[in-house]
Regions:
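Catalytic machinery of carbohydrate-active enzymes
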Residues: 1-378
Length: 378
């Protein structure tokens, strides 16, 4: 009988959020089980308040530690493995596709007698890390469906595809204070988007960062689009980015780029520096709209049910599109920088006229209720 289950997901924020439907399916299949997840420390806030989990375990990857602290990283990982083995898990699930040696090794090192995952070729030297699973085949389906499909291989049915994310109330309160200090009347407390602020406006979070070159949008384009969101839709602009210096080898930041975008805007944006993931999650939860490129932020918005427009580069939407009906995906030849500002503004107006706050957005669009399907994958 399976009483203790470990899910291993040691990659990034969006990947972790795409695992949350599988966590729901596991909880429904094993309502009394101890269900734990092991994630990288920087992803902790993505699952810390997840109601399907009994426990969240973390470790810090070596690449996210300062140089010269290799021994500290090894000690941290060794300590994490000791904690895992002490828990005596019955089932460990390596929740990555295709096969990841580091992910499968963590499942193996946990000492569980049953280790489920997507299997590598039969000749792979580390195939023994897993003793249950399925062949990955072509990685064509969505990541959410890949996670659910792995569970289906051992008879666990899905329990929906929606992502789950609970914001930290203390972090939300802190963001409200920061908005007030920035001169923006705070949104009303409570669940869901912030709603109206002074003058009937709402909040748009514009996230400019992306590590992939093909997924970056020109800074001048971000500035023009942000001005259009403010002028046409009456949205106050929260400028969001990966904080820090661009030369930081651990977590490269875009402080300089954020300043450049702000200088290029006619409107005055609110700088929203979020060193901690829980702060970024809280900020998104208080917004009415998100504009971003294809990264973790789009999955945060989807999990929080916030309308969005996402600019995709080379990344395949069939695998990584945000799981939501409230959005549009824009693509152009595998490069985000080929998408025009006019396309982004038109998509934003369309999304907000359909899923925004009613008549204000319909009026901005020049229509009174026409509906068209979003191009995002739900």
């Amino acid at each position: 009988r399976v009483r203790r289950i470990l899910v291993v997901r040691n990659d990034n924020i969006g990947d972790v959020l795409c695992t949350t439907p599988a966590l729901r399916a596991l909880r429904r299949a094993f309502p009394e089980a101890h269900l734990a997840i092991l994630v990288a420390e920087h992803c902790r806030a993505a699952v810390l308040r997840n109601p399907d989990l009994t426990e969240v375990l973390t470790y810090t990857k070596a690449k996210h530690r300062p140089r010269g602290l290799g021994l500290a990283a090894l000690w941290d990982l060794t300590h994490a493995i000791r904690r895992l083995r002490a828990q005596r898990f019955d089932l460990a699930i390596a929740m990555r596709r295709p096969f990841s040696r580091s992910n499968a090794w963590l499942a193996y090192a946990a000492g569980a007698p049953f280790r489920l995952g997507y299997l590598p070729p039969a000749s792979h030297p580390f195939r023994f890390f897993l003793n249950l699973g399925r062949e990955v085949g072509a990685v064509a389906s969505h990541e959410v469906d890949g996670c659910l499909g792995l569970l289906a291989s051992i008879g666990i049915p899905p329990a929906g595809r929606a992502l789950h994310l609970d914001p930290d109330p203390e972090a939300q309160a802190a963001i409200r204070r920061r908005l007030r200090e920035a001169g923006l009347p705070p949104p009303a407390p409570g669940p869901g988007p912030a709603g109206e602020v002074a003058g009937g406006s709402g909040l748009a979070l514009v996230h400019i960062s992306n590590r992939r070159e093909t997924s970056r949008w020109p800074l001048a384009s971000f500035a023009q689009a942000a001005d259009a969101l403010h002028e046409r839709l009456g949205l106050a602009i929260l400028l969001s980015w990966s904080p820090g210096d661009s030369q930081n080898p651990l977590f490269p930041g875009d402080d300089g780029k954020a300043e450049e975008v702000a200088r290029g805007m006619r409107a005055r944006p609110i700088f929203l520096r979020t060193p901690e993931l829980r702060e970024l999650i809280a900020a998104v939860s208080l917004c009415n709209f998100v504009l971003s490129t294809d990264g973790g932020i789009m999955h945060i918005a989807a999990a929080l049910d916030i309308p969005q427009v996402v600019l995709f580069g080379k990344t395949g939407p069939e695998h990584w599109a945000p799981v939501t009906e409230k959005g549009q995906i824009l693509r152009s030849g595998g490069r985000a920088d080929r998408i025009s500002v006019d396309e982004v503004v038109a998509a934003s107006v369309e999304v907000m006229s359909r899923w925004g706050r009613g008549k204000m957005f319909a009026a901005a669009r020049g229509t009174t209720g026409r509906r068209t399907a979003a191009r995002g994958e739900g």
